[in-house]
C-alpha cells in the first residue's frame, strides 16, 4: 500500500503485516510479516532517512516501526478507539511527521526531532480543528507535502482544505478551501505535491466515481493560498497519488488512479 526509495532498494509495506524490499540491481524481492504481541497490522505509510526505514500502521493500536540490522523496533505506539494514521514523512534525516485522522475533531500530529528515535504527539489543544466529517485520506502516503520547512496537509470528506505549517507542525493555519468535490465521506483532496515553495498540485475527487473529472484537481502558484481548478476536459478523474518529476522545472508530473497511470508535461 506504500513504498519509498532507499539508496539501492525500494522498501514497501502493506496489508496483513507484510513488508519487504526490492533490490533494484538484481530485481529480487524479499518479503516478511511482522506480528507484534499478536497484533497483525496493516500498513499504508512508509518513510526513510539515510539511515533507517520506517513504517506506520493504520487502526488501533497505531504502531510505528524503525527497521534496523537487528530487526524491527517499535518506536511509537498509540491506543485509542479512533486512532488511524494516514501519512508518514521525513523532511530530512532528523525531522519526521505523521498525520492521522481526527480524535474529538482535532487532527492527530506526531513528530520526531532526532531521526525517529523518539516520537511525540502534538497536544490536542494545539492540533488543527476539523469539521465534523472532515478527515485525511490514507492515499498512497501522499496527503502531506513538504518543501524546506514548509508542510501542507489536505483534507476531505465533509470539507476539503489545505492546512499549512512552517514550524515543524507545532502551529497550523487554515490556508484555503479547495475547489474540489466535497461534502461526502468519499470526496475531497487525496494527494498533494509541491515542486517548490510556491507551485503545487492537489488531486482527488470521489473514489466511488473514479471517472468523474469535475472537481478532481487544482493548481497553486502562491504557496497554497489560492487554487485554480484543473479544467474538466484536462482532468483525469479520481486520483490517489501525484508527484512532480525532479529537475523538470515543475512541468512534468505523474499521477496514479484506478483509471491508470498518467503523465503530464
Show which residues each predicted segment covers:
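Extracytoplasmic beta-rich repeat domains
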Residues: 40, 123-143, 176-191, 230-241
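Entry beta-strands of beta-propeller and related beta-repeat scaffolds
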Residues: 9-11, 52-55, 94-98, 150-152, ...
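Short, solvent-exposed loop/turn segments at conserved positions within beta-propeller repeat blades
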Residues: 59-60, 102-106, 156-158, 209-214
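Loop/turn-rich, solvent-exposed surfaces of beta-rich toroidal or solenoidal domains
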Residues: 205, 211, 231-263
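Loop-centered beta-sheet repeat module
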Residues: 129-176
